[in-house]
Amino acid sequence: MLNEKKMRVKVDLHVHTVYSPDSSITLEQLVFWAKKRGLTGVAITDHDSVEGALKFARETDFLIIPGTEVNSRDGHVVALNVREVIPKGLSAEETVERIHVVGGVAVACHPFALFKGSLGRHASSKFDAVETINASASPFKRSLRKAEAIAARFKLPRVAGTDAHYAPAIGLAYTVVAAEPNVDAVVKAIANGRCQPFGESVPLRLKLAKYFHYFK
């Protein structure tokens, strides 16, 4: 939680780009919509890849937290502040260990959302944080409620992200972090619980627009 008078940043901690096969978001779109929504930064979390995150971070002064969404055999895991691919197909626990080995932070993302490769009972105290608000999760309120319960059970920090695959969704969920606006400070503050999630569900019209764009 936020209870200190320090600099605060506003970051969407779960965004996909054109380096994910199911996303259409370019660097220009990402920066435009992030700034439009008043964000300080964005975590790029492409599926089993860090290529886009590293490339985009080199090409803009906007705060980009390099990450990836790892397809573990137990469900999806978001790794923040990693600069190499985490092998997919490992158990959730092994995935978290690999993330820690390379200095990253492991987030149990959308742990109870339907149709998203969610962790469910595999979310554990091994994680550094729980994504309690995922703007793309369905059913939204049920997912939020169950994720909150897991975070409380394991006494883990709570974060939020949109899981955006279509640019106008960026920033509909975000995390406010008590930290200086740089990658290491933000990620360290998240791991230490100096953060608070906010957000809403992606409107149906944006979800439909995403699929129209993808299949056209």
Annotate each predicted stretch with a short phrase.
Residues 8, 99-107:
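Short beta-strand/loop segments at the ligand-binding rim of alpha/beta enzyme cores
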Residues 1-17, 21, 27-32, 51-55, ...:
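Charged catalytic cores and adjacent phosphate/nucleic-acid-binding surfaces used
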Residues 46, 110, 162:
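Glycine-rich, histidine-containing beta strand-loop boundary motifs that form or position
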Residues 30-48, 105-107:
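Divalent metal-dependent hydrolysis catalytic cores, especially in the metallo-beta-lactamase
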Residues 107-115:
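Aromatic-lined carbohydrate-recognition surfaces of secreted/lumenal glycan-active proteins
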